[in-house]
């Protein structure tokens, strides 16, 4: 297979059109999303959007383990540690600014894409991978799907638009997922509105064949969507999806995080002694996670309960860059992915010890509103 970071193909359809296929091509890193991948994807999506022969787009990952396991945080770590040695010293964040700006712009583009865009969410779909998947017209999950937003383990928070879409879940569920980095299966994704259809992995080639044979009518937006839906209808098997993990525990989850502040929610989860293995794993992940991140999870969900998706991305860009400059992100990545000692030295011992000023400082924008890199997001064609 080619060593290009993203592979592009166009499948001819029976109606004389073509289906654009984009494949993330870094299986050794579980298709971790690099800046080069982001640039190539957006450029091709822009071209396909105005190419009348393209009737639909299919996005997938290479290999059999992951669609995309997240953003390329190792590259970010290396740039930050090369540009500013001391933790919390105000690192030079040029790559971070460039990367997050491009990533969020691409994610927003997918949310607002004018043609039906399908995401084959097979295997691991985490962090930046979920950012690519969340805005798809049809988000397809399989028996191997594992979705999570585990940013609390590296001193970050659920970004990639999660500040907006986690708020669209049942009360408390988004906060719980963000605090614990809980892993979700296909049924959970369907139950929580993070996926649209369950299709067994073995049917991938059959689904693509059905899409090439579909009727796309007059190629209006409605006709393109109808053609895709009809093709997918033939292969959906929702009844065979694995049993969910969230819905059986939703009352318990809501009792843990409902009507409280971040330190109280964290304390309740850590004091819980669940017999269920999934709940216990979530508790353990929070116990090892970044205390400052717990506050960021909570604060971002509060700030974006009623805002637009574009506003959420703008706020996330500020927070993500500041986490790289001043927060625990570098230490979290070091402990988990570089030295792999899994013993991060967080800035604060627990959530109750995090002062309000430490949280507020990370929300101070390094740009004026006129200089914000995503100031035009949502206002024109390029931003969706």
What are these regions (language model features)?
Residues 136-159, 193-208:
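Gly/Pro- and small hydrophobic-enriched strand-loop and loop-to-helix capping segments
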Residues 265-281, 286-384:
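Long, low-complexity C-terminal extensions of enzymes
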């Amino acid at each position: 297979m080619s060593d290009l970071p993203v592979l592009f193909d166009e499948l001819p359809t029976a109606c004389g059109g073509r289906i654009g296929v984009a494949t993330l091509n870094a299986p050794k890193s579980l298709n971790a999303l690099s800046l080069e991948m982001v640039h190539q994807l957006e450029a091709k999506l822009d071209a396909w959007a105005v190419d009348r022969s393209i009737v639909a787009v299919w996005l997938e990952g290479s290999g059999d383990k992951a669609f995309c396991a997240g953003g390329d945080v190792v590259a970010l770590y290396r740039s930050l540690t090369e540009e500013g040695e001391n933790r919390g010293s105000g690192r030079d964040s040029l790559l971070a600014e460039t990367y997050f700006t491009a990533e969020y712009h691409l994610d927003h583009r997918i949310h607002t894409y004018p043609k039906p865009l399908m995401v084959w969410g097979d295997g691991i779909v985490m962090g930046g991978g979920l950012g690519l998947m969340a805005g798809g017209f049809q988000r397809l999950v399989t028996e191997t799907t594992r979705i999570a937003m585990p940013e609390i383990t590296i001193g970050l928070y659920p970004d990639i638009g999660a500040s907006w879409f986690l708020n669209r879940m049942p009360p408390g569920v988004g906060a719980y997922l963000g605090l614990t980095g809980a892993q979700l299966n296909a049924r959970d994704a369907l139950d929580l509105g993070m996926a649209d259809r369950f299709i067994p992995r073995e049917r991938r080639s059959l689904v693509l064949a059905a899409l090439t044979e579909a009727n796309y009518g007059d190629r209006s937006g409605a006709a393109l969507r109808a053609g895709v839906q009809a093709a997918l209808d033939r292969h959906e098997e929702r009844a065979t999806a694995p049993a969910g993990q969230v819905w059986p525990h939703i009352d318990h989850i809501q009792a843990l995080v409902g009507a409280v502040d971040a330190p109280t929610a964290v304390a309740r989860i850590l004091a819980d002694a669940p017999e269920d293995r999934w709940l216990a794993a979530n508790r353990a992940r929070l116990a090892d996670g970044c205390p400052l991140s717990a506050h960021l999870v909570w604060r971002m969900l509060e700030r974006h309960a009623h805002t637009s998706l574009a506003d959420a991305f703008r706020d996330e860009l500020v927070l993500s860059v500041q986490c790289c400059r001043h927060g625990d992100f570098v230490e979290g990545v070091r402990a988990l992915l570089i030295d792999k000692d899994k013993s991060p030295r967080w800035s604060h011992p627990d959530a109750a010890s995090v002062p309000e000023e430490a949280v507020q400082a990370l929300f101070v924008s390094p740009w004026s509103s006129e200089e914000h890199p995503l100031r035009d997001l949502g206002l024109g064609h390029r931003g969706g």
